[in-house]
Amino acid sequence: MKSVILLSLAACAVAAPTAGVETIHDGAAPILSSSNAEAIPNAYIIKFKKHVDHKSAADHQMWIQKVHGEREDERLELRKRGLFDSVNDAFTGLKHTYNVGSGFLGYAGHFDEETIEKVRRHPDVEAIERDTIVHTMRYEEVKKDECNPDLEKGAPWGLSRVSHRESLSFSTYNKYLYSAEGGEGVDAYVIDTGTNIDHVDFEGRAHWGKTIPANDQDIDGNGHGTHCSGTVAGKKYGVAKKAQVYAVKVLKSNGSGTMSDVIAGVDFAAKSHKAQVSAAKDGKRKGFKGSVANMSLGGGKTTLLDAAVNAAVDAGIHFAVAAGNDNADACNYSPAAAAKAVTVGASALDDSRAYFSNWGKCTDIFAPGLNIQSTWIGSKTAINTISGTSMASPHIAGLLAYYLSLQPASDSEYSLATITPEKLKADLIKVGTVGILTDIPKDTPNVLAWNGGGCSNYFEIVSKGGYKAKAQADKSSSLLDSVTELEKAIEHDFRVISGKVVKEASSMTGQAEKLSEKIHQAVDEELKHFFGEARV
């Protein structure tokens, strides 16, 4: 029986093909095998040589079908005689034909050894490879943004507030949750009294843009602009800690100026932004995401200032402006009434509207504005605590810069973030905390700014939408309790710090007791002032 099988296979091997001009040659094509894949028995992929055209390929495939058919007829006869296992000796022949562009002509099939030997020795065949099992690539589940924020301890309460949904408590009042990349690639124009650009909190990211008033110096002689700049982009005091700050001085040291100078400052910012856009598109500035501007100033209603601000927004600048400090309708003030800017009202530590803050339908959003600590003038380390919608607005300018920097990278590393000021303004309001504030007049949006809790996935933040504050039966009482709780927490922190100072002092001098008394007196005075303001 064995000799019959061998003779039959031998006879098949020397049988000449009958299809067309197919011939056999001595140089056989290699059979390739993968060393790290599971091969399928008797399954092969065949690639033709480059000279083979479509007609020759079709002729070859007809030939291999004929060879395979003849082999199957012979095996069928042997099966009838019980000489082959009908299950283990099944060959299906031609499976696929390939014509991949102009670089790959071939076919695949399931052939016995004798047939594949004929294929190997065919002059049109370049290579043969054993077919193998393939699998999907190993993958990891796509995880949603787990929101692993950076944490700034000992942060100003305003920063803490914009990074938490609920009212501040013992565990959150001085903790700012943020994304470390916040502000990167963004220019912030602070149109104000100037900026102390040498302050250490700016880490060299503050620059002098332009002094608009004639015959004035390139310094901040007031402090207001420096304070705003620190809230926008300071390392400790800023919302967007990697933004570049540009001082645009439009007000003199006494804090006043002319509307024409203010409009000139807006014009400067718009032109500077346009120049940076061109630089980015020309490949001269890498990683530029866009520009924001803050204007914590204002006066009576003026159509042209509002028009200038709106035009700057149309030019691509994301603009934040203060609502005003007269406890009146913001629509009666400029640039608070500029429709395309983000007009910002001020909130207090207890989540009430700050007693001085303007309100009304022209107010878009609220941000912390009472007792805000930030950078100041007089030295490279000076700080000051002041209040106003002037302090609320830079929280929003910083937040606009922060959100701009979180925009996903575009195809070109030099391209701008594609989000428009109109869209970002809408998103900013959309994700805000709704209904948390008290003493909000009718027709005034009850929305407090939020930075996404430190998450860096912008679309994840926006897709979740806004957050409606939990209802409270007696919110005024609850908020008073919150302030009392915070008072105890902050006082505790002051006491701990002063205790450490006294401990150090006792090892150096016998005046520790007197020093301790002075420290506690200072703490008591500071707390009395701070919470007196917070309870107004």
Swiss-Prot record:
Active site: D192, H224, S390
Enzyme class: hydrolase
Localisation per UniProt entry: Vacuole
Pfam family, one: Inhibitor_I9
SUPFAM superfamilies listed in its UniProt record: Subtilisin-like (SSF52743)
Keyword Hydrolase listed: yes
Membership in a protein family: Belongs to the peptidase S8 family.
Protein name stated in the entry: Subtilisin-like proteinase Spm1
Gene name, Swiss-Prot/TrEMBL: SPM1
